[in-house]
Amino acid sequence: IAATESILQQIRISTNSKKYGTIEGGGYVWHTTGSGKTLTSFKTARLASRMEGVDKVLFVVDRKDLDYQTMKEYDRFEKGAANSNTSTAVLKRQLEDPHARIIITTIQKLSVFIDKNRAHDVYGKHIVFIFDECHRSQFGDMHTAIIKKFKRYHLFGFTGTPIFSANAGAGGKYDLKTTEQAFGRQLHIYTIVDAIADGNV
């Protein structure tokens, strides 16, 4: 709940101060595996989608199986609350549909959509991106594409393994080395120590 409130507050503040479309408009949540990250992300997506001025919430996963798994989990929490897609064509229709408020998709489909649609109305909409497991796979090309194309966005990442400067490594072609450089400041933390203390793992 604290993580959800932190994200919603960040959306409110950065929207009021016109900081959407910048690193200051987002942030990341460090949640250990088994701490109810999917439920937290669902509640966040649901409440963010109801905020005044927010057009869509995109929940982005990095693999097709996670896409299906997340949809199943979301349906368990609230049937029909989110929209998943089997292809980029379906994703495009959902992005154009004002009633599709929460969309679950993969990085790959989002990348293809951006490649195929150089100009699109959705790029000017107020979009909240929530990346699940926001580590290396989201860095680089996809991140660059989003910040180039979308104008009024908030980027949030959930991760069990944040990358700090100490473990970022020197190699790689990407400018983004740490979770903070990609998503903004840490908004909430729930580590393995907290999970053990609470009896969740």
Report each predicted region and the residues it spans.
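RecA-like P-loop NTPase motor core of helicase/translocase proteins
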Residues: 1-201
